[in-house]
């Protein structure tokens, strides 16, 4: 059965990764339906495109589907999952559906604990600049295409590869990018060693004629891939890398190391509108993918110059009364440090007020020590209750306790009640930069603050 003739039903279609895939299959010509507990902007967009979306989960929603696609957020006892099992309808994770689309194209898969969405969107910007009409699947709304997905007529597919449940092993890309490997999603992997092995095994899926692109700044990551049996390219700020990036404040240069001759030469220069060393690294990874696909460096640089960002990544929401409001998805200590350093780079003299909502009890517990020192670039930190993401509370793991152990002099526990917006408005003054951080629903508070300024 060809994809365009199949009937797909998505369980959890409102999720940021699921909605893009549903849109892509709909545009290919497949019959697509979906369901979610709550309606949101993603489900509304799908409805506008003509996709049938059910609010809530019920066995009848499955209908005459040929295959049921589920997200990692869906619980085992979901009635639609049970219905598919009872009727022996194939059940596949999101990554397997993406893998089926990737089989029709030349795939570029962007993996890594941090920076996947940004790197995927930067890579997409480069391929768009080169007029290659790529198919795109991103875990965030990409400003250049005003969506999370786009069906292109070209031969390349640029996709974000989510490692959180290990299902990215379903993908077989021609080019794989690994931005970094950090200790996260231990609710699935159990140990950091399992996380490392998962990325190693993902990279093994690349064919002999493909390329694995890895940030080599982390010695542990270099160790994992040092004698890797595929064509590999290390990039980063460290002089040991094959491609070395230098520069700061939005202007960067890339040099190529010739290990055999012991020489180094300039490959090219590029400019970025988005601040931060982490974004410079993301950009170099995207350049590597572009050049590997035959795109000239100059075209890659032009694509990056056009890059305006992606939703929920250093996202400027607006300014009123001299107060700027931003939102960022960062929810791991490594991400928090990187994004706050980027804010400090962009606003060296302004007061930075950060509202942070931890995401998952398990992550908060595992990263507890790192969280206590992750906010040093902020001037004031407001720590609200943990967003559970379906997890049960863990005794002793609370935001109130974490706030009391923070090394930051001006960190405090903040109750998000019906007076929260007014309390924050009372703290802010002209010239401040207010940032909502986290993978939960804290961004809504930022909009409320902006609307009431």
Swiss-Prot record:
One of its GO terms (cellular component) is cytoplasm. InterPro entries: Mur-like_cat_sf, Mur_ligase_C, Mur_ligase_C_dom_sf, Mur_ligase_cen, Mur_ligase_N, MurCDEF_pg_biosynth, UDP-N-AcMur_Ala_ligase_MurC. Keywords: ATP-binding, Cell cycle, Cell division, Cell shape, Cell wall biogenesis/degradation, Cytoplasm, Ligase, Nucleotide-binding, Peptidoglycan synthesis. It catalyses: UDP-N-acetyl-alpha-D-muramate + L-alanine + ATP = UDP-N-acetyl-alpha-D-muramoyl-L-alanine + ADP + phosphate + H(+). It holds the Pfam family Mur_ligase_M. Its EC number is 6.3.2.8. It is found in: Cytoplasm. Pathway: Cell wall biogenesis; peptidoglycan biosynthesis. ATP binds at residues 112-118. GO terms for biological process: cell division; cell wall organization; peptidoglycan biosynthetic process; regulation of cell shape. GO terms for molecular function: ATP binding; UDP-N-acetylmuramate-L-alanine ligase activity. Cell wall formation. PANTHER family: UDP-N-ACETYLMURAMATE--L-ALANINE LIGASE, UDP-N-ACETYLMURAMATE--L-ALANINE LIGASE-RELATED. Belongs to the MurCDEF family. This is UDP-N-acetylmuramate--L-alanine ligase. The lineage of its organism: Bacteria, Pseudomonadati, Bdellovibrionota, Bdellovibrionia, Bdellovibrionales.
């Amino acid at each position: 059965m060809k994809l365009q003739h199949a009937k797909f039903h998505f369980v959890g279609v409102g999720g940021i990764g699921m909605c893009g895939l549903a849109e892509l299959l709909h545009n290919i010509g497949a019959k697509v339906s979906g369901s979610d507990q709550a309606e949101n902007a993603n489900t509304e967009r799908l409805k506008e495109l003509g996709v049938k979306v059910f609010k809530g989960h019920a066995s009848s929603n499955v209908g005459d589907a040929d295959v049921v696609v589920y997200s990692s957020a869906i619980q085992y006892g979901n009635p639609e999952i049970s219905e598919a099992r009872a009727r022996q309808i194939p059940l596949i994770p999101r990554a397997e559906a993406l893998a089926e689309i990737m089989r029709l194209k030349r795939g570029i898969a962007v993996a890594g604990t941090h920076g996947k969405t940004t790197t995927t969107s930067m890579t997409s910007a480069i391929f768009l600049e080169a007029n290659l009409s790529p198919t795109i699947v991103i875990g965030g709304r990409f400003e250049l295409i005003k969506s999370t997905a786009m069906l292109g007529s070209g031969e390349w597919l640029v996709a974000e590869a989510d490692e959180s449940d290990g299902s990215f092993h379903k993908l077989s890309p021609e080019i794989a990018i690994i931005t970094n490997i950090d200790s996260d999603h231990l609710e699935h992997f159990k140990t950091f060693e399992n996380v490392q092995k998962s990325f190693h095994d993902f990279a093994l899926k690349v064919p002999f004629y493909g390329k694995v692109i890895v940030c080599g700044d982390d010695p542990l990551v270099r160790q994992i891939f040092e004698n890797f049996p595929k064509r590999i390219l290390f990039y980063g700020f460290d002089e040991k890398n094959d491609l070395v990036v230098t520069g700061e404040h939005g202007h960067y240069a890339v040099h190529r190391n010739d290990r055999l001759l012991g020489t180094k030469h300039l490959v090219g220069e590029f400019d970025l509108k988005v601040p931060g060393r982490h974004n410079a690294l993301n950009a170099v990874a995207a350049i590597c993918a572009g050049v590997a696909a035959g795109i000239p460096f100059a075209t890659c640089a032009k694509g990056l110059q056009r890059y305006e960002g992606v939703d929920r990544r250093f996202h400027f929401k607006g300014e009123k009364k001299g107060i700027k409001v931003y939102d960022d998805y960062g929810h791991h200590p490594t991400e928090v440090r990187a994004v706050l350093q980027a804010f400090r780079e962009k606003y060296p003299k302004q007061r930075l007020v950060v509202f942070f909502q931890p995401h998952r009890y398990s992550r908060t517990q595992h990263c507890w020590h790192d969280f206590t020192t992750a906010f040093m670039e902020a001037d004031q930190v407001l720590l609200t209750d943990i967003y559970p993401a379906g997890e049960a509370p863990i005794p002793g793991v609370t935001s109130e306790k974490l706030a009391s152990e923070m090394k930051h002099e001006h960190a405090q526990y903040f109750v998000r009640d019906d007076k929260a917006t007014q309390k924050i408005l009372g703290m802010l003054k002209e010239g401040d930069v207010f940032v909502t951080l986290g993978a939960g629903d804290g961004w809504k508070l930022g909009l409320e603050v902006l609307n009431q300024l």
